């Protein structure tokens, strides 16, 4: 999966095109940036990239944010910024942290950044913002490779050498951000994707992989609807990998799939890969209680369910609808009536004390 966007500043006559994707086999996201001179004369360009490095649990976005930033240990390398907090913050018992967060960069020909702004403070300054940082307004030079900073909010900002861009010419930049427990991987990955040629090859590999996961196309006469239907078929793949609410500022859940998602994934797979759907339907029915309610936390294994969030049993008006409509479509598509004779145990992890209290 990938996305591309372009932005042109007509008054300045410069265009930036950005392509973002995840290279296969590397726990990172790669961003290719192409800056094009749209004018009819030479232009001096000095590019500074800036991506914040949050570097800890989503829980700390609002809770103990400052305290957890004090745990950051930040250093700059030849190609980027690396942050490894000393502890994983947990009031029940703090643990030694092994996760490393990084942001690396290079020019399309492999040229390394000239200097770095490894902390939010050094980049935005006292009066600036992320959109108007003091480091750019004041033409700050940053720090070189090999510097270290402790106890600050980390920032993957790096300044590249100033270049003269001829009329109509372009220059490429490659940015790589990720996380790993391997202390060598960040710098190794930076060398793997430090040129446009390497990044383009990784993109083609990733594109072929994702295109192969959706093995169906639509021709309704409406190209927009065709693309939308293909996107719908692709969503269950993303949900299996990332969950539903995987962003730290999302306000619902912790990223796992929910009851509706199980059945909606089955509906999609009826089109993409029908042979898997029978077992998925049977496994999903294992989350139904004998009173018609259902478990609300989905386990890691097929057919595994956990009792309700916060130990509160709830009833949603549409939850019973999804097993019905999914099974009905499966029967109509396959004619597999034998599935109705299969035995599946009810979900039992519940206390009915609250029900007896009203008797």
Descriptions of predicted regions:
Residues 22-25, 29-139, 189-215:
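Polysaccharide-binding surfaces and accessory modules of carbohydrate-active proteins
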Residues 20, 291-320, 326:
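Aromatic/His-enriched, Gly/Pro-containing loop or helix-boundary segments
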């Amino acid at each position: 999966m990938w996305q591309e966007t372009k932005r042109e500043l007509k008054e300045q006559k410069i265009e930036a095109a950005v392509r973002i994707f995840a290279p296969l086999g590397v726990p990172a996201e790669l961003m290719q940036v192409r800056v094009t001179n749209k004018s009819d004369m030479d232009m001096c360009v000095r590019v500074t990239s800036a991506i914040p490095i949050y570097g800890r649990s989503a829980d700390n976005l609002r809770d103990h944010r400052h305290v957890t930033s004090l745990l950051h240990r930040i250093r700059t390398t030849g190609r980027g910024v690396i942050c490894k907090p000393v502890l994983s913050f947990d009031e029940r018992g703090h643990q030694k942290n092994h996760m490393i967060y990084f942001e690396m960069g290079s020019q399309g020909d492999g040229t390394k950044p000239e200097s770095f702004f490894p902390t939010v403070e050094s980049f935005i300054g006292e009066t600036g913002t992320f959109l108007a940082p003091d480091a750019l307004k004041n033409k700050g030079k940053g720090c070189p490779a090999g510097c270290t900073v402790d106890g600050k909010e980390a920032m993957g900002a790096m300044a590249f050498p100033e270049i003269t861009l001829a009329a109509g010419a372009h220059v490429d930049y490659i940015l790589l951000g990720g996380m790993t427990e391997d202390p060598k991987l960040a710098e190794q990955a930076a060398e793997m994707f430090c040129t446009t040629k390497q990044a383009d090859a990784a993109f083609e590999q990733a594109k072929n992989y994702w295109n192969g996961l959706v093995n169906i196309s639509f021709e309704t006469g409406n190209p927009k609807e065709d693309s939308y239907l293909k996107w719908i078929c692709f969503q269950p793949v993303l949900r299996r990998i990332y969950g539903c609410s995987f962003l730290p500022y999302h306000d619902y859940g912790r990223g796992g799939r929910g009851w509706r998602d199980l059945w909606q994934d089955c509906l999609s797979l009826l089109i993409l890969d029908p042979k898997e759907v029978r077992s998925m339907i049977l496994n999903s029915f294992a989350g139904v209680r004998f009173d018609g309610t259902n478990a609300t936390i989905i386990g890691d294994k097929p057919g595994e369910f956990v009792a309700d969030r916060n130990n509160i049993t709830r009833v949603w008006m549409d939850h019973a609808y999804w097993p019905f409509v999914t099974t009905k479509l499966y029967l109509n598509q396959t004619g597999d009536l034998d599935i109705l004779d299969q035995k599946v145990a009810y979900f039992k992890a519940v206390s009915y004390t609250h029900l007896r209290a009203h008797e």
